[in-house]
Amino acid sequence: MNKKTLRITGAQMSFPVGAIQKNKQTILDCFEIAEEKETDILIFPELALTGYPPEDLLLRESFIGKNFAVLEELAEFSSNTSGVIGFVDRNLDEDHTDKQKRGIANAAAIIQNGDVKGIYHKCYLPNYSVFDEARYFAKGNNPGNLFWYNDVAIGISICEDIWIDEGPSLQQVENGASLIININASPYDQNKSNSRKELVISQAKKLKVPIIYLNMVGG
């Protein structure tokens, strides 16, 4: 990474479940502010478009389609500020290890200058406590993929991915990432704030790169 300053803004706010149009407007409002402040990368939480957890809304094809259409609209709107946005993607890879799943993924899109520049699929799907992701999503199978902003190699991961020592972030760093961005929609727990902070600090030390950790609030 060169010495140029990279301006990164996190939109850590509420994205209600099912309110795709409302969430779209929130994202657009954030982009307008970010452009004014000359932000390089604007980060949104896990599944910011659909809200989290969307659960059985994912069984509605119209809901998935609306999520796609809005992502395309947001990409067309984007300009110099790059955005990392949580959404639901299709996962139709014939070689995928989870063929029994519905062919959708918990994903993050990277948008900039009117286009979708890249997509990351969440690899580790929690299926305990309030989490039921394995019921709906297929696992991502390209954990080491990188996203480039100018000459900076960036690894994107989603929530549970950052908890795994030999997981996506390690592969991304081995592939040359000099920064990790991890987006989340983890529920509030008064006892977990410190443990999450300690986890991210520990992973940053192990990987020897900065980690930006963004959560959703409200819901």
Regions found by a protein language model. Name each.
Residues 1-219:
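Enzyme catalytic cores with a strong preference for nitrogen-chemistry domains
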